[in-house]
Structures are given as structure tokens and as C-alpha cells.
């Protein structure tokens, strides 16, 4: 009877991912500890698997997106009540969205058990921008802009060199400085291609940047960021904003 219950998830083994911190930076790695505890009966575990997930907005509504996925360990047997711990390195891809009030990212951990309901664990994490993306944010701050909103949206694949089918858009509004009386907002979409960061930028448009780019609108520009240097990025951003405003 215990075997039957375990197969439908009752009294089955459990898994928990323990991170040293809830705040991670895109493009970096973190060591994690995986805790597996046996249930009421012995079970054969084919693998421990992970998925880094978020969601994005499309014309059909919100869709789930897997940013990255991988597996850990060779098959093993977890005995009833046994506790096992594994260590692994979790890589946070550079394309991972920055978490905000409207954007969430989670790590899902599961046990692959044949002929049974796979038990799992979900951990929401805070994702900070890559150093180069943060440098762009810092440059905008120096120009008097503050972040107003962000969202993950379906992207125009022909305009983005990326394997993802979505991109994160950030909307900044001027609070002070030269552009306070000149523009309503600046929208940017950072996109990584190999080791290069391209920042797509639009100024003072009613439609969102991703929507405009889908229509091949030419009222936008892009910048390439090679180093996390806000002082070098700031004048280039200022020139681009002036040209588009």
C-alpha cells in the first residue's frame, strides 16, 4: 500500500534546494545544497532536475518560459526516511530577467521518479542585473532618469540575436537634469549576443519599444556596451536621447 501511495505523491521522497542567498546576479554562479529526504518507502531516483523559470506577456496572454534547465546526479535509491545532501553549482544566465515588482524568477527542483508523481520544490529568487546592464542603469540615473516600470514581453525574433523568445523592457522617466522637460520616458531593452551587450533604446513613444520594433519602426537606436563603465556610457546615452527626442 505504501508503494501505491508513494507513486501518487503521498509519502513520497521530498527535495529542497538551499541557496546561500536569495539575491543572485545574472551572469554569475552560486553554490547550492540539495536536500533529498526519503518518504515512507524506498524509491529509485533517476535524477534531480532543475529549471530556471519566469513568465512573459504575449498577444495570447502570459506564458511560462524556461530560461535554463539541467540535471544533477546519476540514478540512486533513497531509502525510507533517509536524508541525502548534494552540492551543485547553479549558473544564472546573463539573459535572466531582473526581478522587479512585475517580474518574478524561480528555481524549480524536482525528483525524476519512474512511474510516480515527481515531487518538487520552488524557490523564488531575486535577480540583480549584470554589471554592464547595471552600468547602463547607473548612467541613466546620472542623466536624471529613474526606473518607472519593467516587463518581460514576446520579442521580435528578427530584430534580436538571442535564443530566447522574449525580452525584458525597462521604462525610465526623467526626474531632473537636461531631459526633465524634453522627454516623457526612455525605454531600453538589453540583449546579450555572445559576450556583447546591445541596448535597444527608444525615446518618448506611446507604444512600447518591443511593439514598435515588431513593426520595424525606425524611430529607435541601439548601443553596444563592452565594459561596465557608467562614465563612458553616459555621454553616448545622452547623445542618443537627444537625437531621438
Residues of each region from the PLM?
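Terminal, compositionally biased non-globular sequences in eukaryotic proteins
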Residues: 1-70, 74-245
